[in-house]
Amino acid sequence: MRNLRLSALLIPLILAFTVTACATVSVPITTTISPIVPAASPTVDNVPTDVAIIDPVNRLEDFNPDNFDDSTNIDNLWYPLKPGTRRVLSGATEQSGLTIPHRIVFTVTDLIKVIEGVRTVVVYVEDYSEGDLVEAELAFFAQDNDGNVWYLGEYPEEYANGRFVDAPAWIAGLKGAQAGIKMKSEPQEGTSYSQGWGPAVNWTDYGRVDQLGQETCVPLNCYQNVIVVAESSLAESDAFQLKYYAQGVGEVQVGWRGADATKETLELVEFTQLTDDELAEVRTKAFNLEQSALKHSKEVYAMTSPLE
């Protein structure tokens, strides 16, 4: 939900320019899921969904650092995070009646960061609006012994016209922040859960398993047995992002429901395994962002152990 709010904040400030795409030699990743012609699309009517509000006192997840023996081996069926994989989702948001091109590049690095005694996988995320980089982010995930993928925090830098604007970081264990669950090992329809708690920056996202067994097609492929998770936050409980997850891939589509002013829609257009050189480039970007974090987030990020 935070990316959605970021677009609403920064889009009016951004100067548009034309971007020429660079050629890539990354290897496309194929999965064992056969293409299908969808018999029924997911039901995403623009009406509020009945998502239980997460009580900040009673509904936070029970995080146990001792339950993470092999935490960086994230092989969750719906949210695998293999180092060197990259997902690119492309689409649009709406702002003042205008359709704004939007693209997110999600790259799993081979870096590790220890948070609350747990070794986490570092993901490097780039968020583009009209071709401009409006956010770069370090995100931290770990898988517990039961196969659940946890979210232990993030360091996002927000930009407008190429200049730093803000860095609303939250990391579990600091300033009241607590880890949440990104993806259950066995999602059950109707189950809701906190995705993290960062009160210092009003990060209160939660998810609810909205639908199971769906079929959907995106530019890259068609997928069956897709699950749909409705995500919202305590501050925006009438606005939902609908995130579609395919087996062996992860997030393949994003839609919206309710009072979402930006009406963000995204579809998977690239799913690749980076070359060693490409992964090294992303690693350098992550280290550079960490150096910036030490400057801009002295009370949060600077209090953590460095990337490994």
Region annotations inferred by a language model:
Residues T18-A21:
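C-terminal motif of bacterial Sec signal peptides marking the signal peptidase cleavage site
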